[in-house]
């Protein structure tokens, strides 16, 4: 007796098959806007305690799928687990965000270990296995890492900064030392992503949250080239792996990013100019995005209009509906449902 094959819309669009109604998910879809997430977070304790408890991490990954039926689940974790697995001190202070011991001089960079200890990330891989087992068959599981540049900004400064000046200054003043950090992160990210694929991830996303602070020449060196090396390194072992890049704020550098990195899809923020993206990018790769997270808080007619704009702007090619960045904690659940209903009803 032959079973019917289950279609995964998210994987289908990344494989070249345009969907009439775009598949959708939200960055940070497992998060504080959900009461069920807050309940698990309270049980777990600290943020990293939640990341490194496989059962809890899998549970919060699954929560938005159960509630909204999104087409993709992204494993609950954080981009800074990579420096943690490189032996760096990583902690999350309440109300202050991540804190690391800064690598703010060439001498300190020389102490950076070159080999990632994947055993420190076993909980992430266990969470992927649990999640893959529990997901509906039509739902795609996404694994991820931060881009080397974005992760390096936290490692150099020891915390987040508005314009990432500490990392940029090191890249200008001590390019050899900064390149060492990037090289270590490239190799570590390749190993980490391959291990996620082995554990059940079906698609990968590379988050370059701070790419937009770089001028064009530095963007090519510190965003495009490291991403290209990661994509190449993953596919050397796992040919055909579908990979999405998110060079937030890339602007006019977006076409170069797509052309040179080899990604299958590119996520865009809400400031991207639609006609530019359609003309220069969407004919080559899947476009993912790009609803402003703040209009999702507003709701009402403003949300309907913004959703319609995104759908119409990218209906002529392959598109994954998403936000332009992560959902905000104060977002009403009813507004997510409003957005979801409108996207599902669209037939491009």
From Swiss-Prot:
Associated pathway: Porphyrin-containing compound metabolism; protoporphyrin-IX biosynthesis; coproporphyrinogen-III from 5-aminolevulinate: step 4/4
Any coiled-coil regions, as ranges: none
Matching CDD domains: URO-D
Residues annotated as site: Transition state stabilizer: 78
Keywords linked to the UniProt accession: Cytoplasm, Decarboxylase, Lyase, Porphyrin biosynthesis
Binding-site list for substrate: 28-32, 78, 154, 209, 325
GO molecular function terms noted in the UniProt entry: uroporphyrinogen decarboxylase activity
Gene Ontology annotations of biological process type: protoporphyrinogen IX biosynthetic process from glutamate
Any Pfam family hit: URO-D
Annotated localization: Cytoplasm
EC id: 4.1.1.37
Any one Gene Ontology cellular component term annotated for this protein: cytosol
Reactions listed under catalytic activity: uroporphyrinogen III + 4 H(+) = coproporphyrinogen III + 4 CO2
PANTHER family from the UniProt entry: METHYLTETRAHYDROFOLATE:HOMOCYSTEINE METHYLTRANSFERASE RELATED (PTHR21091), UROPORPHYRINOGEN DECARBOXYLASE (PTHR21091:SF169)
Subunit-level organization: Homodimer.
Protein family per UniProt: Belongs to the uroporphyrinogen decarboxylase family.
Function per UniProt: Catalyzes the decarboxylation of four acetate groups of uroporphyrinogen-III to yield coproporphyrinogen-III.
NCBIfam families the UniProt entry points to: hemE
Entry protein name: Uroporphyrinogen decarboxylase
Gene: hemE
């Amino acid at each position: 007796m032959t079973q019917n094959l289950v279609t995964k819309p998210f994987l289908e669009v990344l494989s070249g098959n345009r969907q009439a109604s775009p598949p959708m998910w939200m960055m940070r879809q497992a998060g504080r806007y959900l009461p069920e997430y807050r309940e698990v977070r309270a049980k777990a304790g600290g943020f990293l305690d939640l990341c490194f408890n496989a059962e809890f991490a899998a549970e919060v990954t699954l929560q938005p799928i159960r509630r909204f039926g999104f087409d993709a689940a992204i494993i609950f974790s954080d981009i800074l687990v990579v420096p943690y697995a490189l032996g760096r001190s990583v902690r999350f202070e309440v109300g202050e965000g991540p804190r690391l011991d800064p690598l703010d001089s060439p001498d300190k960079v020389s102490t950076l270990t070159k080999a990632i200890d994947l055993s420190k990330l076993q909980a992430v891989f266990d969470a992927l296995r649990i999640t893959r087992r529990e997901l509906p068959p039509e739902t795609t599981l996404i694994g991820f890492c931060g881009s080397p540049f974005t992760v390096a900004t936290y490692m150099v400064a020891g915390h987040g900064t508005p314009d990432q000046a500490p990392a940029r200054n090191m890249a200008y003043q001590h390019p050899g030392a900064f390149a060492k950090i990037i090289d270590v992160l490239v190799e570590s990210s390749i190993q980490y992503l391959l291990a996620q694929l082995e554990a059940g991830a079906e698609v990968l996303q590379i988050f370059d949250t701070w790419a937009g602070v770089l001028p064009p020449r530095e963007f090519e060196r510190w965003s495009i080239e490291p991403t290209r090396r990661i994509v190449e390194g993953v596919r050397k072992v796992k040919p055909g792996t579908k990979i999405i890049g998110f060079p937030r704020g890339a602007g006019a550098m977006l076409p170069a990013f797509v052309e040179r990195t080899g990604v299958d899809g590119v996520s865009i923020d809400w400031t991207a100019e639609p006609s530019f993206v359609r003309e220069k990018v969407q004919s080559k790769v899947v476009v993912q995005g790009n609803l402003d997270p703040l209009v999702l808080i507003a709701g009402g007619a403003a949300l309907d209009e913004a959703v319609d704009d995104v759908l119409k702007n990218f209906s002529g090619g392959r598109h994954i509906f998403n936000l332009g960045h992560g959902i905000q904690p104060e977002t009403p659940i009813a507004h997510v449902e409003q957005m979801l209903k409108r996207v599902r009803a669209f037939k491009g």
